[in-house]
């Protein structure tokens, strides 16, 4: 049975449009609270990023949880991985994140973590959706008895707890002293956390895009817009730059030359560092979108590589299935399960900094062992949300077949719908730049015409 509301990363959409409305959020809180209250401590944590709509949705979810008899602990603006960690340490039934990650401010979303710090499984989400449907369509939402209503409290030391957790993943014998780092927090949830983590570990930090006003989150900054970070690294003659997205679950780097180091290259750096010390256990999990250059570079070190479906939840599932610990996406979602239960931009960045220090080389030098193959990704925005019917059209399928025949064994094609936006993503990868671009545009034109 497929999920109706939960996409690859929870519920997400434009604020004010269903389902990102106060009414939906309240009923979702009630449905989730009813399911969670049947087994656990009857307490949830709610964190959010810096979007102005977070206040509205937070209050609505509070009401829903309270109506279900579940207590709520509010931790304010907080990175998504911090909510996953704190839900576990506070022994809550679940953590709730109100965020649309790297999306613009006018979008928002809601996702859940279990008390073990992982995403809810499909079965739990289906159970919540079944109750939610009744609340939305049959007016089935009912309060518990007055004396059993949930209470709400604020936790003031959540940021400090998470900062110490992040620092604890970095070896005690190492220091960032002597490193000049530019940190771009995307005017997002880590604006008051990330710079302090690196400073407290000894780095000289230049912090940019750290003044959220509710509407500037991810606005030409952060992990999806690296221009300002590249400029700042060059202007300040920094050793490197670190960019997080709005909820700090993904990270990208810029080396001292101003060149981008993406998630695929980060995975290579971490695998290479572990391999050089004889500490690489198992292999690496990427996704269908991972650059073929990563797979080839890992193969040179005899490190196994498998591809999961796109979405960090599926990378986690594949890691658990294989028993491996390292995985991620080119977009900067990095999973290092020996350190964190979910993708954590700050924690992943610290592991890269560890690799830089231990190698006694620059970031630019330690990424040089991987050569990225030309990869073109075209996002075709849809007028309607019916991506499945477009993907099923004969003209689109024939375009893919022709492109694959043209590329042969020198490349690959991937066509998929976005789990978070009304987009179809066209990805083509091959050994030749011109061939890659031409075939990607050919397929994208077929999608637009469908």
Swiss-Prot record:
Gene3D superfamilies per the UniProt record, alphabetical: Alpha-D-Glucose-1,6-Bisphosphate, subunit A, domain 3 (3.40.120.10), Alpha-D-phosphohexomutase, C-terminal domain (3.30.310.50)
Enzyme class name: isomerase
EC number(s) reported in the record: 5.4.2.10
Record-listed Mg(2+) binding positions: 101, 245, 247, 249
Record note on modification: Activated by phosphorylation.
Cofactor: Mg(2+)
GO terms under biological process: carbohydrate metabolic process; peptidoglycan biosynthetic process; UDP-N-acetylglucosamine biosynthetic process
GO cellular component: cytosol
Catalytic activity: alpha-D-glucosamine 1-phosphate = D-glucosamine 6-phosphate
Database matches in CDD domains: GlmM
Keywords of the record: Isomerase, Magnesium, Metal-binding, Phosphoprotein
Active-site residues, Swiss-Prot/TrEMBL: 101 (phosphoserine intermediate)
Note describing how the cofactor binds: Binds 1 Mg(2+) ion per subunit.
SUPFAM superfamilies registered for this protein in UniProt: Phosphoglucomutase, C-terminal domain, Phosphoglucomutase, first 3 domains
SS bond list: none
GO MF term list: magnesium ion binding; phosphoglucosamine mutase activity; phosphomannomutase activity
Transmembrane segments: none
Matching Pfam families: PGM_PMM_I, PGM_PMM_II, PGM_PMM_III, PGM_PMM_IV
Modified residues (Phosphoserine): 101
Family statement drawn from the similarity comment of this UniProt entry: Belongs to the phosphohexose mutase family.
Function: Catalyzes the conversion of glucosamine-6-phosphate to glucosamine-1-phosphate.
Name listed for the protein in its UniProt record: Phosphoglucosamine mutase 2
Organism: Shewanella baltica (strain OS195)
Taxonomic placement: Bacteria, Pseudomonadati, Pseudomonadota, Gammaproteobacteria, Alteromonadales
Encoding gene per record: glmM2
């Amino acid at each position: 049975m497929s999920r109706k509301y939960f996409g690859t990363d929870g519920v997400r959409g434009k604020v004010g449009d269903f389902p990102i409305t106060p009414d939906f959020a309240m009923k979702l809180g009630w449905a989730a609270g009813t399911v969670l209250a049947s087994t656990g401590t009857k307490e949830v944590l709610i964190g959010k990023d810096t979007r102005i709509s977070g206040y509205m949705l937070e209050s609505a979810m509070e009401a829903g949880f309270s109506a279900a008899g579940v207590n709520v602990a509010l931790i304010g603006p907080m990175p998504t991985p911090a909510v996953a960690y704190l839900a576990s340490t506070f022994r809550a039934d679940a953590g709730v994140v109100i965020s649309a990650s790297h999306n613009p401010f006018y979008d928002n979303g809601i996702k859940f973590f279990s008390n073990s710090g992982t995403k809810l499984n499909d079965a739990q989400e289906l159970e919540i959706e079944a109750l939610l449907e009744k609340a939305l369509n049959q007016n089935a939402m009912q309060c518990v008895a007055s004396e059993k209503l949930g209470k709400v409290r604020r936790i003031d030391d959540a940021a400090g707890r998470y900062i110490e957790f992040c620092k604890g993943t970095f070896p005690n014998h190492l220091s960032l002293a002597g490193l000049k780092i530019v940190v771009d927090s995307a005017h997002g949830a880590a604006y008051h956390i990330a710079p302090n983590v690196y400073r407290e570990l000894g780095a000289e930090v230049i912090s940019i895009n750290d003044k959220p006003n509710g509407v500037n989150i991810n606005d030409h900054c952060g992990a999806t817009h690296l221009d300002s970070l590249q400029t700042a690294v060059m202007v300040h003659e920094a050793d490197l730059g670190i960019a997080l997205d709005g909820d700090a679950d993904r990270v990208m780097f810029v080396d001292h030359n101003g060149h981008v180091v993406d998630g695929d290259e980060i995975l290579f750096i971490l695998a290479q560092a572990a391999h050089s010390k004889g500490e690489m256990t198992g292999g690496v999990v990427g996704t269908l979108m991972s650059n073929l250059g990563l797979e080839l570079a890992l193969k040179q070190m005899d490190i196994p590589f498998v591809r999961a479906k796109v979405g960090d939840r599926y990378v986690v599932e594949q890691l658990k299935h294989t028993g491996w610990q390292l995985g991620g996406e080119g977009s900067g979602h990095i999973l290092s399960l020996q350190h964190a239960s979910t993708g954590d931009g700050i924690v992943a960045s610290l592991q890269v900094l560890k690799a830089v220090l231990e190698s006694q080389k620059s970031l630019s030098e330690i990424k040089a062992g991987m050569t990225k193959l030309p990869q073109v990704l075209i996002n075709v925005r849809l007028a309607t949300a019916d991506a499945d019917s477009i993907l099923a059209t004969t003209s689109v399928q024939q375009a893919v077949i022709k492109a694959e025949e043209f590329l042969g064994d020198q490349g690959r094609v991937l066509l998929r719908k976005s789990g978070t936006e009304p987009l179809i993503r066209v990805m083509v990868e091959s050994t030749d730049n011109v061939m890659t671009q031409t075939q990607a545009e050919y397929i994208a034109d077929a999608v637009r015409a469908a």
